């Protein structure tokens, strides 16, 4: 790009920066020297390929979505938490908010993730152990007791039963007297990643996609600030993928949901701003930064050039980041504080919109209160003490970072071509029921391609660890020292017994005729092809449980069986 074009871009950026609201903060170094909000080529310099880098807040958004970077608003500290029953988790949320957390992120237990009630025999021994147990709207009310849902943003990592759980959230807000139009947060409705990596689905893929489409329509019409579809790469990376695979599979899943919205006749400029993303921040510092920068650039280009998005907000890739649980070790667990800090810094330098930092004890148990507080303080030290929020994309222009960004983008584009090719094999006439990327994803799920590719990457990494080619301190190098015992959080089995007892009381107290009628109405909607959200809300209002709602739909739609593979 020639010097004139670069200066034109700088002037556009400056005008937008000047017009934007900034935080009241001291944007100087520790020595007192002022720092610019962004850095770029010197006036008069040329820079080949600068149009791919650009300025913050301008297409292709490599350097961030906003002209101010974090000077306008810092990332949201959103700590993932949930254990035991709703009352216990409510107390943890209040602790997080009181300690300076900016939002909430709900971790659900395994029965809830699988759409089962706490009294289901298959739930025995799992209730409240890896997250909070939620059986009905009454539990959701307790979960957010004394936390005004109109004032706090809430993320829910739930996937399979995402739609009925979100209906419980809406009913809890209703009972607080909160207008659904002001609710803000994200819902991890992404079902593709369940078939690809996490393996916690409920139905066949097509009914899941139908529910997601219903929710997209419903939220676009009445809950504009809420992001009804968070597309997750985190679970893909934690399953063993490479950074490029995480990026490509996640963005491809996002493109699939865009095709789903378009197939429903929705306006891309209306529904696409409701999509958000969830990425892993692994320990390879510069590769992670490059991954985040490439993600914004790829998404913007595809949304504009492939799917016809005209508004900037429809081209924006907003993402939450969680530090890499898979990078943490049970050996010498205090080292995990350092790993998490490095990963969090990579996420911030990559421009994350919100961040969860893992606790040092998560390889051993759910985080203790002390470990959770250290994880929270890690972000606060980065935000308040280091100056990393003063300059937008401070590594932009680095030869290393720019080449890494280009490389990971090119690797992702190759994977997109592989996915499209699989879609063409499924529909050689080019008549895709939803869209070409969606066809490729469904074909890759059905024949086990995604799972096989991730397994191969995980195997190669494990081989490198065992050979010593990849070093992990405390595991295969520097293994000698002992760092002391940790206080471990243990969820009592009494929690399960109490949850089952309360569930029985609530079932006994409800109007069974109303419950049966609401479930029948939901089933009728499932059979007719009508939008499922209002009938599901009626079932939730009648105190139908999660297991009952999901059970009706399982019986109607069937359960997916994964293909065997070695």
Regions found by a protein language model. Give the residues of each.
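Phosphate/diphosphate-binding loops
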Residues: 1, 135, 153, 158-161, ...
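Catalytic alpha/beta active-site cores
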Residues: 1-282, 287-288, 306-309, 313-320, ...
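Flexible, glycine-rich loop/tail regions that form catalytic "lids" or insertion modules at the edges
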Residues: 11-46, 55, 59-61, 110, ...
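Short acidic (Asp/Glu) and glycine-rich catalytic loops that position anionic groups and cofactors
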Residues: 73, 119-122, 150, 192-195, ...
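Generic secondary-structure signature for well-ordered alpha-helical cores
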Residues: 101-102, 145-149, 171-179, 213-225, ...
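Short beta-alpha connecting loops at secondary-structure transitions
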Residues: 125-129, 194-203, 236-241, 279-287, ...
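Extended, hydrophobic alpha-helical segments in both membrane/secreted and soluble proteins
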Residues: 165, 169, 253-254, 277-303, ...
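Flexible glycine/proline-rich, aromatic-decorated loop/lid segments
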Residues: 267-271, 309-323, 331-358, 363, ...
């Amino acid at each position: 790009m020639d010097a004139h074009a670069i200066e034109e871009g700088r002037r556009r950026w400056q005008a937008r920066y000047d017009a934007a609201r900034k935080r009241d903060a001291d944007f100087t170094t520790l020595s007192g020297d002022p720092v610019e909000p962004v850095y770029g080529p010197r006036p008069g310099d040329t820079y080949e390929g600068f149009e791919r880098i650009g300025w913050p807040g301008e297409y292709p958004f490599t350097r961030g979505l906003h002209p101010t970077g974090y000077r306008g608003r810092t990332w949201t500290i959103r700590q993932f938490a949930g254990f035991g029953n709703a009352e216990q988790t409510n107390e943890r949320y209040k602790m997080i908010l009181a300690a300076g957390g900016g939002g909430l992120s709900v971790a659900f237990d395994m029965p809830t993730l699988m759409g089962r009630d706490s009294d289901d025999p298959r739930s025995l021994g799992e209730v409240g152990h890896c997250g909070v147990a939620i059986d009905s709207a009454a539990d959701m009310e307790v979960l957010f007791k004394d936390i005004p849902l109109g004032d706090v943003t809430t993320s829910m990592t739930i996937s399979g039963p995402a739609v009925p759980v979100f209906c419980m959230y809406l009913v809890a807000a209703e009972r607080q007297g909160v207008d659904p139009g002001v609710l803000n947060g994200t819902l991890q409705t992404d079902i593709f990643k369940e078939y690809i990596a996490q393996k916690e689905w409920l139905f066949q893929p097509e009914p899941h996609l139908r529910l997601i489409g219903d929710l997209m329509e419903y939220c676009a019409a009445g809950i504009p600030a809420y992001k009804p579809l968070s597309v997750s790469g985190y679970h893909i990376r934690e399953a063993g993928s490479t950074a490029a695979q995480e990026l490509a599979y996640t963005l491809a899943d996002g493109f699939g949901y865009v095709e789903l919205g378009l197939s429903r006749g929705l306006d891309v400029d209306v529904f696409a701003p409701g999509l958000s993303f969830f990425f892993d921040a692994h320990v390879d510092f510069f590769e992670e930064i490059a991954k985040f920068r490439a993600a914004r650039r790829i998404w913007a280009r595809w949304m504009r050039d492939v799917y016809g998005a005209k508004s900037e907000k429809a081209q924006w890739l907003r993402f939450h980041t969680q530090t890499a649980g898979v990078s943490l070790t049970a050996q010498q667990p205090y080292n995990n504080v350092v790993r998490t800090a490095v990963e969090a810094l990579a996420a911030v330098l990559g421009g994350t919109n919100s961040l969860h930092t893992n606790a040092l004890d998560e390889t051993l148990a759910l985080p203790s209160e002390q470990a959770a507080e250290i994880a929270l303080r890690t972000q606060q030290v980065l935000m308040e003490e280091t100056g990393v929020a003063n300059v937008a994309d401070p590594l932009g222009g680095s030869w290393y970072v720019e080449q890494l960004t280009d490389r990971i983008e090119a690797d992702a584009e190759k994977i997109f071509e592989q996915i499209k090719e699989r879609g063409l094999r499924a529909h050689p006439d080019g008549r895709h029921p939803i869209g070409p990327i969606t066809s490729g994803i469904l074909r890759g799920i059905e024949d086990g391609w995604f799972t096989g590719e991730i397994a191969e990457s995980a195997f190669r990494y494990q081989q490198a660890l065992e050979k010593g080619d990849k070093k992990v301190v405390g595991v295969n190098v520097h293994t000698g020292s002992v760092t002391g015992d940790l206080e471990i959080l243990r969820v009592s089995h009494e929690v399960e017994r109490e949850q089952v007892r309360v569930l029985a009381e609530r079932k006994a107290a409800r109007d069974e005729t109303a419950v049966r009628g609401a479930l029948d109405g939901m089933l009728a909607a499932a059979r007719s092809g009508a939008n499922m959200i209002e009938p599901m809300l009626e079932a939730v209002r009648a105190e139908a449980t999660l297991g009952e709602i999901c059970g009706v739909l399982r019986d109607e739609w069937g359960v997916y069986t994964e293909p065997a593979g070695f």
